[in-house]
């Protein structure tokens, strides 16, 4: 009975939050209120408000405020600062004319490609490869927004389509060494090499190709439906005094991430890399004119870009975190797990139920990790009791959690991308929805073809 009540409370609050955001209310305010309501109800029901890793203040009422403080410190101190630095860097690149120079140089070879959608797909594949270097979905999305997004928009790709491309790469796990893959391999009771390279990687590549094709047709359909015209920026209209080599500057963070990964050079945090990139740009600006005042004034533009990112993106991430914690403490995720365990032992039915529940949990909480980590614990037990191959359950669940995050209006990557693109999170979700559904279907079909469903097929083979 309690499971039904917890699910009902979660669904009612989710519907209420969605309704007010769609009506145009501040997403930050609505998510804060929704999260606080859930946390208060959780406290009244006797649930612990703070995560297990945090120490209680001794009073439930102050624990709620304490969690907001924890989020403010963690979001602002690490992820938030990274977002602010990237937004400040992007603003500085525009100010010094580096972004204009990228468009000016790129437009010459790109003019031979008539369709902006082909350029968009090329950008998507590049972004997917970047996911091998940047494991954080939000971090990758923000990095792409600061580098690829301005280029895509300026060569004729609509803002919505470009934002969807930046939000999509982490929807499918490509890296064979990510924490999620390691955990899934353990649950699947397979060696990591076999699980990651022989099974998961081919399924991931198939899903990425399918999503790329879906992006091409879906973004084109939405642009036509919304009467969005694609006009390549006239190169003659671009007036910049920046030298041609400045076109490399917007991409220095990507180059830095690839170089300073611990293999080619020292392993540096992306914020450290961004500081180096901004210092490099500032030094070049000084060498160009030997005008210290102009250099310092230009850096002020970067600082204002950081401030705008705090107000528009970081606080929205904090609010989304409060909402996700509210759903977790109310018992919403645990209720979904209880539903999954109540289904029969037919392999395809159990797999589909787990995939749907994992995806729903990811969509409502905005987290790709939390639902998968919650569900993956029960895979070995479920698999053995039902005579099912654990890998048959873990692979689609692994991908479903990340796909669900990509169509969650409260996920960090969607919120950050929408904030930087200055569009609604629901617009990003609409743009990513069909590619995500296509990706999920391919994952399910490929798993059915490539992974034996019965555990006897594994042990007997």
Protein language model regions, located:
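Core transmembrane alpha-helical segments of multi-pass membrane transporters/permeases
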Residues: 32, 52-100, 271, 275-334
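Hydrophobic alpha-helical transmembrane segments of multi-pass integral membrane proteins
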Residues: 82-85, 111-147, 316-320, 343-381, ...
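Membrane-interfacial loop-to-helix junctions in multi-pass transporters
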Residues: 3-7, 73-80, 108-122, 155-161, ...
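Short amphipathic alpha-helical coupling elements at transmembrane boundaries
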Residues: 70, 101-111, 150-154, 297-308, ...
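Long, contiguous bundles of hydrophobic transmembrane helices that form the permeation core
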Residues: 2-14, 18, 31-38, 42, ...
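Membrane-interface alpha-helices at helix entry/exit sites of multi-pass transporters
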Residues: 104, 113-122, 152-166, 193-199, ...
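Alpha-helical transmembrane segments and, especially, the helix-loop junctions at the ends
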Residues: 127-144, 149, 154-194, 211-215, ...
